[in-house]
């Protein structure tokens, strides 16, 4: 069974990085601005101030680069799942976690949705749902919890951006009142089948759930 909860050694660097962005970065940038403003005629002092500002901005630049990298990885996985016959959500029904480590795409026309999470390096969750193989969806603040029917992953969580959580719940509730036909294929099985191929192609571990 894959371990989703991050260990203490994994959490500590993330916490320190978050604190640096929230608390350390503004202070460093402020010091740099003061250094430039106090002696703007002194080229050396000005360059030093600019360097300090860049150092202060670097955590945000790194966070942006990591988010872009995560989104790029997820998009590669999605390219193997999306098709006009099985799963093709409209852009407004594709939701990303704030740091792009998780994705939820909802195909309202076909009654399917896909959850992807980059758990850690080399480990990815890729799960397909129709309107029958999940228990419920709840919103706790901005944390969306999908309750599944699998013992290995009873709850799948995803942070949401402002307003997205309510939109997801509203959309799913609307879809629950529709009558979808799944005569041609079993969508969760389709995703699980593709997950094996994706795991081999991208050299990642994707757990398969029954």
Predicted regions and their residues:
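Acidic, Ser/Thr- and proline-rich intrinsically disordered linker/docking segments
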Residues: 2, 135-210
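Generic detection of short hydrophobic beta-strand segments and adjacent strand-loop junctions
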Residues: 95-101, 127-129, 153-160
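Alpha-helical transmembrane spans
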Residues: 9-73
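Short, Lys/Arg-rich, polar N-terminal cytosolic tail immediately upstream
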Residues: 1-9
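Anionic N-terminal interaction surfaces
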Residues: 45-113
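Phosphoinositide-binding peripheral membrane targeting modules
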Residues: 109-143, 149-153
């Amino acid at each position: 069974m894959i371990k989703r909860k991050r260990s203490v050694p994994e959490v500590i660097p993330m916490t320190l990085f978050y604190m640096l962005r929230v608390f350390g970065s503004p202070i460093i940038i402020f010091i740099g601005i003061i250094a430039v403003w106090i002696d703007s005629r002194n080229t050396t002092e000005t360059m030093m101030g600019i360097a300090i500002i860049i150092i202060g901005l670097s955590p945000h630049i790194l966070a942006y680069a990591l988010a872009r990298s995560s989104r790029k990885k997820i998009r590669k996985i999605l390219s193997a799942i999306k098709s006009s016959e099985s799963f093709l959500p409209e852009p407004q029904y594709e939701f990303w976690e704030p740091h792009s480590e998780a994705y939820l795409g909802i195909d309202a026309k076909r009654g399917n949705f896909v959850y992807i999470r980059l758990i850690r390096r080399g480990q990815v969750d890729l799960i397909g749902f129709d309107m029958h193989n999940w228990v419920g969806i709840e919103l706790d603040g901005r944390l969306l919890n999908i309750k599944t029917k699998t013992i290995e992953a009873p709850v799948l969580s995803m942070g949401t951006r402002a307003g997205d959580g309510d939109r997801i719940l509203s959309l799913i509730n609307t879809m629950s009142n529709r009558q979808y036909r799944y005569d041609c294929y079993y969508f969760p099985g389709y995703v699980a089948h593709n997950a094996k191929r994706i795991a081999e192609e991208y050299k990642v571990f994707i757990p398969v759930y029954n």
